[in-house]
Amino acid sequence: MNDTIAAIATPPGEGGIGIIRLSGPDAQSIALRIFRPVRPGRLRSHRVRYGHVIGPDGEVIDEALLTLMAAPHSFTREDVVEISCHGGALPVQLTLEAALAAGARLANPGEFTLRAFLNGRIDLSQAEATLDVIRAQTSAGLAIAQAQLGGWLAREVRAARTAILEPLAYITALIDFPEEGIEPQTVAGPIEQALATVERLLAGADQGMVLRNGARVVLVGRPNVGKSSLLNALLRVERAIVTPIPGTTRDTLEEMANLAGVPVVLIDTAGMRTSTDPVEQIGVERAAAALAGADLALLVFDSSQPFTPEDEAMLVATADRPTIIVWNKCDDPDVPPPPAPPHPKAMAVVACSARYGHGIDTLAKTIATTLLGGTLPAVGATHLVSNPRHRAALRRAAEFLRAAQETLAAGAATDLLAADLTGAANALGEITGETVGEDLLDMIFSRFCIGK
């Protein structure tokens, strides 16, 4: 990290401003080679200067604002300079090219955040939260990411890891003196404390994962039960074509929706039936594929029509999938829907009318509640583990800690107990970045954009 990197920090295309970011030991000197302030003088940290960006041949590229954030009071803990110019593609690109010609290197994806991590500005879980903030699709997901960026998860994990390291140091010292033996009370308490923390973090992980990553929800049923109308009602826009002709939908249609704070991909499908129409049959096959890849199925029936063999076939088709049974076309809310047919994985039954909007809010909330395991998170609940990598590391830590408890209770060899505790400590260290290799870091930071 002895060089200075530069990249465009704003999205491509036209906008109000475009930002070129530099970080490294030569950020100030490079910036002054390409930026001519209207009022001469040295750059001051966290102050904005007005001037012009100058190209390699002395030509004016654009008028701009320059902001210096001097080390260590910057995101990367290095000297950081941001040049804000007009947001057209050409001024931004020419400003970046001028910085590169003046001695900067084009940054790799996520390299600014990587430098912040390597310089101790943030831990690895906070680095990942930075990307989660950028990619958040709902306010709940954003709140979880912001809380993780604030360091709550790192504090919890470090506390659990410290509780492990103290007895581990004690046990390691005894390996060379096995005749002294382990005092169980010295070790059991910290192990129990660490395991309690890990289990508490895991308890909210399933909800956190859904709120961060979303879920795929497929609408299935025989033709003309109102699947496309339900999709439009849940989206609150006319996205799918709706006609009274069975088989109108010939392909899958995917749309993103925010249902009670849960990011959901809603998938409308062709009515599933045997057809001699080759185009419709392709649609039926795609519907089956969408069902196989869904987290939840909305099995739609027409409450105004008798139950049919095709409806029975849909019960079989969804038997291995968590399912909400939806009675559509309940246009009169005072008339109860038919009894729900038996289904081995039915999570709920909802009556609604896509035509008049009755029960649509209830359906949306039921979808969200089902995906979150039966309950919506409390208002303001942001301390939820939401990253699959973190959940996997916590699960490994819990396994090692339970094994350590069994090893201790059995009075087994000291080195076996030390191995269990070392495994738990290393698993927790993977979350904060204290025990990770370069390959994992490369994988994580490659997901970032170049300017972050």
From Swiss-Prot:
Which co-factor is required? K(+)
Q: Which molecular function GO terms apply here?
A: GTP binding; GTPase activity; metal ion binding
Concerning Gene3D superfamilies, the annotation shows: P-loop containing nucleotide triphosphate hydrolases, Probable tRNA modification gtpase trme, domain 1, tRNA modification GTPase MnmE domain 2
Is the Ribonucleoprotein keyword given for this protein?
Answer: no
The free-text note explaining how the cofactor binds reads: Binds 1 potassium ion per subunit.
Disulfide bonding pattern of the chain: none
InterPro entries attached here? G_TrmE, GTP-bd, GTP-bd_TrmE_N, GTPase_MnmE, MnmE_dom2, MnmE_helical, P-loop_NTPase, Small_GTP-bd
Nucleotide-binding is among the record's keywords: yes
Question: Where is GTP annotated to bind?
Answer: 224-229, 243-249, 268-271, 353-355
User: Can you tell me which residues bind K(+)?
Assistant: 224, 243, 245, 248
A cellular component term (GO) from this record?
Answer: cytoplasm
Enumerate the subcellular locations listed in this protein's record, separating them with semicolons.
Cytoplasm
Query: Which GO terms of type biological process are on file?
Result: tRNA methylation; tRNA wobble uridine modification
Name the principal localization, coarsely classed: cytoplasm
Q: Which SUPFAM superfamilies match?
A: P-loop containing nucleoside triphosphate hydrolases
TM segment ranges? none
- The residues the record assigns to binding (6S)-5-formyl-5,6,7,8-tetrahydrofolate are 21, 82, 121, 452
Which amino acids does the record list as binding Mg(2+)?
228, 249
Query: What Enzyme Commission number(s) does the record list for this chain?
Result: 3.6.-.-
Q: Which residues form the TrmE-type G domain?
A: 214-372
Q: What is the annotated quaternary arrangement, including any partners? A: Homodimer. Heterotetramer of two MnmE and two MnmG subunits.
What family does the database annotate?
Belongs to the TRAFAC class TrmE-Era-EngA-EngB-Septin-like GTPase superfamily. TrmE GTPase family.
Q: Which NCBIfam families match?
A: mnmE_trmE_thdF (TIGR00450), small_GTP (TIGR00231)
Q: What does this protein do?
A: Exhibits a very high intrinsic GTPase hydrolysis rate. Involved in the addition of a carboxymethylaminomethyl (cmnm) group at the wobble position (U34) of certain tRNAs, forming tRNA-cmnm(5)s(2)U34.
The identity of this protein, by name, is tRNA modification GTPase MnmE
Source species: Chloroflexus aurantiacus (strain ATCC 29366 / DSM 635 / J-10-fl)
